[in-house]
Amino acid sequence: MTPFTEGIILLCIGIFGLAGNLLSIPYFLRRRPGQKTFYTLFIYLSVCDIIVVIIGMLLFGVPKVSEKYAEETFLIIAPYILPTFEIGSTGGIYFTMAICIERYLVVCRPFWYREKAIKSTIYTIPIVCFSVLYNIPRFFELKTVIDYGPVYNDTNKYLSAKDKTFEITADFDEKMENVSIYSIEATAMRLNVAYYGIYHIGCAIIFQFIIPLLVLIVGNVMILKQLLKDSRGSSPMCSDGARGRFSPQVTQHRRRKSQIGRTRVTLAICGIFTACHLFKWVLNIYELYVRYNLSEKETEQLLNDSVWFETVVSISNTLVVLNSSINFYVYLLKICWMA
């Protein structure tokens, strides 16, 4: 598959996802106040998904279909939008975890949940603050460098960051004076071995792999066990909307059915999230293994000059954008299926 085709596919996924996420915000704002926490978390997840989708298209889609954009605009904005992409991605990970935790409390600890009357701010404020603070160092990792000078016939100028993250070839048919040539270079902080090992590998594996995976696995297993018990009628699930009073039998049955529906949506979203982020997690673990078991030269060859590694990275980026594009559609499909 050519890079142009890959870019078109990612852009189509992104446009489809952007439309869904933009529609999801007014949709969830109109939901019943009894499930305010669940829908508020979904709204924040949609905002994070919008950030990931828009910037994902600018980073991984548009450069593959527009040479002019890739040679100038991309190289100017990449050092700033790449950290913003990571903020949205981190927020998406932790809001998915928050939705899973909220469903666990509603399903497995309904009376405690109703008694404590937990509000959405308990989740949203820490997640937003953590997502921003955790990714602040990324704003100081890359910089755009502009070179000025004449360019002659048949001259190919190869530009790349010091870590070979970005590269560009500029071809000119005739002599041109004072041409601006853009490139991206890694800063001294980004090139620091200790910083890269601790932040990019160690922290990424802990905060973006181990913790999310454990929370999602444990939370979903507990939810599934409780749903199985509930389906046998041994432990009726209480609604988070029925705080402080018990509803009539029919109303309670409807609320219980609605809760089960939202819980199944959560299980589906968590499963899709895990599948779409699996490539990213595998890449982090593989990079950790390579950097600590091979020489520097072998590491550079495997990570920067390997076609298969670039292909896996491209697939990983596409899957991350895909995950941020389909959450609302999963919710709608589940609601339609229940109806």
Briefly describe each language-model feature range:
Residues 13-17, 44-56, 86, 90, ...:
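Alpha-helical transmembrane segments of multi-pass membrane proteins
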Residues 25, 29-40, 101-123, 217-265, ...:
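Intracellular signaling interfaces of 7-transmembrane GPCRs
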